[in-house]
Amino acid sequence: MKRFSTALLCLALLAGCQAGGVRNFWEKHSIDYSDIRAAEDRFADFAELAVAAPEEDALAAMDVLFDKLKRDTAGYYLYSEWMDGAFYTLLSPCRNAVLYGKAVDRITADGVLEPYECEPFLQKREWMQYNQEGAKAFVPGISRFDARTLVLVLDLGCPTCREALETVAADPQWDGLQKLAVGLGYGPKPEVPGWEYLFPESGTTVFDLHMTPIYFVGNADGTVETGYTPAL
């Protein structure tokens, strides 16, 4: 089976959506994937409609889609991967915690995927609950910020992540903010000036290592001003 391309899906999501509402989308459209590109484009149209639609309608449409997919194991795997790319991937314009949570609820309940295959979806759903815009900021080892703070999350074993320390620090938009670098994984501890450093052992329970380098901005009142954003 052809593997799902996050890059292709993101391009498709940005291209626009078809006319019509989302609630009846999968009653009007097939889940056929014999033409993989057409199926991917069709799902991209659905994802754009879903994130813009009333939540009740979007969730109802998700149920219709999953009910169809339960009769097609190969399609279930394929569409589950597309949902991961559309509703979880940071670069996707359709990243959405509610819709991703709905997808994970169905994936774990429907019994098509094996329990061990559901685990990555469950972990991503948990990661997605942290540091959403307007919610309480959370970094292991920090009770609260005492000033507006730029938090950069990086993989200590990733050269690109280490490069982000210098690139982000040099950006004038962050002048005047406290700067906290949260290092995850294994590797030499960075020493780029201008940053406070934190290396929490439990960091990967909160942050997706594969998503780094990312940053978010926390306010002195303990809330998230700007959610996760690619640092480079």
Question: Residue spans of the language-model regions?
Answer:
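Sec-dependent N-terminal signal peptides
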Residues: F4-L14
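Oxidative protein folding and maturation machinery
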Residues: C17-G141
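Short active-site neighborhood of thiol/selenol oxidoreductases, capturing the structured segment around
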Residues: G141-A170, Q178-G183
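Active-site proximal loops enriched in glycine and acidic residues that flank catalytic Cys/His/Asp
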Residues: L152-G157, A181-L184, F199-E201, N219, ...
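Thiol-based oxidoreductase modules, predominantly thioredoxin-like and allied folds used
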Residues: G176-S202
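Short loop/turn motifs at secondary-structure junctions and domain boundaries
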Residues: V206-H210
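Non-catalytic, surface beta->alpha helical segment in thiol-disulfide oxidoreductase systems
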Residues: M211-L232
